[in-house]
Swiss-Prot record:
HAMAP family (UniProt xref): Hydantoinase
Keywords attached to this entry: Hydrolase, Metal-binding, Purine metabolism, Zinc
Obligatory cofactor(s): Zn(2+)
Described purpose of this protein according to its UniProt entry: Catalyzes the conversion of allantoin (5-ureidohydantoin) to allantoic acid by hydrolytic cleavage of the five-member hydantoin ring.
EC top class named in words: hydrolase
Entry's cofactor comment: Binds 2 Zn(2+) ions per subunit.
Organism: Salmonella choleraesuis (strain SC-B67)
Encoding gene (name): allB
An MF annotation (GO) of this entry: cobalt ion binding
Protein name: Allantoinase
Assembly behavior: Homotetramer.
Catalytic activity annotation: (S)-allantoin + H2O = allantoate + H(+)
Pathway listed: Nitrogen metabolism; (S)-allantoin degradation; allantoate from (S)-allantoin: step 1/1
The organism's taxonomic lineage, starting at the top: Bacteria, Pseudomonadati, Pseudomonadota, Gammaproteobacteria, Enterobacterales
Length: 453
């Protein structure tokens, strides 16, 4: 049999091992994995490279439509491809209108036409004003529902995203449980964080350390405990977003050990940046929950290696530069990190700390695909989509602004020496990014709907 493509001589990350083996691709799918595969229209030599499943980034903000001047599908998904991401799961905010019903999700689909360099799945929003319309999003095919128990949204904009109170969360989770959906939650105590932040501003405490102190670990832990209990009472699967503290992870682990259906994610910035670096970098490293101190970071690495964190995500949430102006307490909170999840974490986790390649593959791709029901994604195995990434290990470069594909070429990682490089990204059998030739094919990404899985 002649295949469309054979990838030869790479160290391939399989689910439970990594070894030098060939991959054959036919019709956009992985057709065979074995030694000495022959006869293909095209052959790629991956000698000396790691061949990983394409990253499934389960937490991405592309602010189109309505705030395309923050980030758009064209720039955002090009950055994703350059960073080794082949599937993103997009959040129902920061776009306007927020994605909270059938009409608003159709606006998203229309806005993305012809612009997706990678594949995308969509989350719906659970907000204070759409409890009677959640079913519309489920029927369209979202793979989960995001909500905030921290304060969220611009109160001056009618169709912006909104946080939920405990009653709204409980009722929404009940409905989502009946739909066999997952609720994803941003967990920080709204009132305490808001009041601590206002208090700091009044007293002129506006440094990075002051911002971190205004969103202490206990505000994350309390919110995680609360939503765990309410989701359990409501009968709904729970996914805790961007955990920043080992104490927060421990709450999820405890609930899981007691039999609750709960998963969690974290982000590269909580593992590679600390509060002192945040102070040096400035507002580009502001996010919530905040980047914490070195002792906290050490605990997060332990939780990651223990297998207590299910997946790593970018939480890519950029904005125009003017929204990062001023002091840290005033600036927009969000990090542009989409393009540098895989290379940074390969360097820090695999090369510097000895993480196994199969564990890396699970954290970057497999587990997220499983959590959100993306049955064709996340694994290098026969029958799966041929979504693959070539990583060149032990290949250092210094990230520059001009390397970035974002609408606004800024990132807290600019100036960082990264010890690995993404050299090629393949989506359903086609090379969509190559380090030497850029983006060789027109955008071919498509939306993945739950009911099509």
């Amino acid at each position: 049999m002649s295949f469309d493509l054979i990838i030869k001589n790479g160290t391939v990350i399989l689910e439970n091992e990594a070894r030098v083996i060939d991959i054959a691709v036919q019709g956009g799918k992985i057709a065979a994995i074995g030694e000495n595969l022959e006869e293909a229209k095209n052959v790629l030599d991956a000698t000396g490279l790691i061949v990983s499943p394409g990253m499934v980034d389960a937490h991405t903000h592309i602010s189109e439509p309505g705030r395309t001047h923050w980030e758009g599908y064209e720039t955002g998904t090009r950055a994703a491809a350059k960073g080794g991401i082949t599937t993103m799961i997009e959040m129902p905010l920061n776009q306007l209108p927020a994605t909270v019903d059938r009409e608003t999700i159709e606006l998203k689909f229309d806005a993305a036409k012809g612009k997706l360099t990678i594949d995308a799945a969509q989350l719906g929003g659970l907000v204070s004003y759409n409890l009677d319309r959640l079913h519309e999003l489920d029927e369209v095919g979202v793979v989960g529902f995001k909500c905030f128990v921290a304060t969220c949204g611009d109160r001056g904009i009618d169709n912006d995203f909104r946080d939920v109170n405990d009653w709204q969360f409980y009722k929404g989770a009940q409905k989502l449980g009946e739909m066999d959906q997952t609720v994803l939650v941003h967990c920080e105590n709204a009132l305490i964080c808001d009041e601590l932040g206002e208090e700091a501003k009044r007293e002129g405490r506006v440094t990075a350390h002051d911002y971190v102190a205004s969103r202490p670990v206990f505000t994350e832990v309390e919110a995680i405990r609360r939503v765990l209990y309410l989701a359990k009472a409501a009968g709904c699967r729970l996914h805790v977003c961007h955990i920043s503290s080992p104490e927060g992870v421990e709450e999820v682990t405890r609930a899981r050990q007691e039999g609750q259906d709960v998963t969690c994610e974290s982000c590269p910035h909580y593992f590679v940046l600390d509060t002192d670096q945040f102070e040096e970098i400035g507002t580009l490293a502001k996010c919530s929950p905040p980047i914490r101190d070195q002792e906290n970071q050490k605990g997060m690495w332990e939780k990651l290696f223990n297998g207590e964190i299910d997946c790593l995500v970018s939480d890519h949430s950029p904005c125009p530069p003017e929204m990062k102006a001023g002091n840290i307490m005033q600036a927009w909170g969000g990090i542009a990190g989409l393009q540098n999840c895989m290379d940074v974490m390969f360097d820090e986790a695999v090369q510097k700390r000895g993480m196994s390649l199969p564990m890396f593959g699970k954290l970057m791709a497999t587990n997220a695909a499983d959590i959100f029901g993306l049955k064709h994604k996340g694994r290098i195995a026969p029958g799966k989509d041929a979504d693959l990434v070539f990583i060149q290990p032990d290949s250092s470069y210094v990230l520059k602004n001009e390397d970035l594909e974002y609408r606004h070429k800024v990132s807290p990682y600019v100036g960082r020496t990264i010890g690995a490089r993404i050299t090629k990204t393949i989506l359903r059998g086609d090379v969509i990014y190559d380090i030497e030739h850029g983006f060789p094919v027109p955008p071919k990404g498509q939306f993945i709907l739950k009911h099509q899985q």
